[in-house]
């Protein structure tokens, strides 16, 4: 009656049950939404703030702090804030929706919406951290590379991005992708706290 070796029985049980397969599908869907959206938005915000840094440094620093705030917030504080915002009758989101004549859905209770609601919250949590990492990568790009690209004919912002910025952000982007993927797969705490 001692402990026995189960081998891969737990995995067989997980993949064999409908509940287990559903959990895996939902996690993969969540990850497929959160990773590209949070990496893309983090890059866009970093590019915007990097471009503003020279002309509006105080505003840029304030915006950096605002975007990074969700990273520094505790899970409980974040969960309470989102529960208040998404409350079915008292929440700010549904109040605005009702004022516009839209239906007020149950964001955290409706089976068809909760996964996407959690994905939006996951993106919100991650964008600030990704922004900081991309800002560090942008700061490491030598200005002389942009000068050389301009001499070679890359005069527009888009060509400068594709020929200099994006290739030089390769290592940073890889790191951001790995960290974002690891965080996206650790979604249990958010789900357990909010739903």
Region roles according to the model:
Residues 1-195:
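A structural signal for multi-pass alpha-helical bundles of membrane permease subunits
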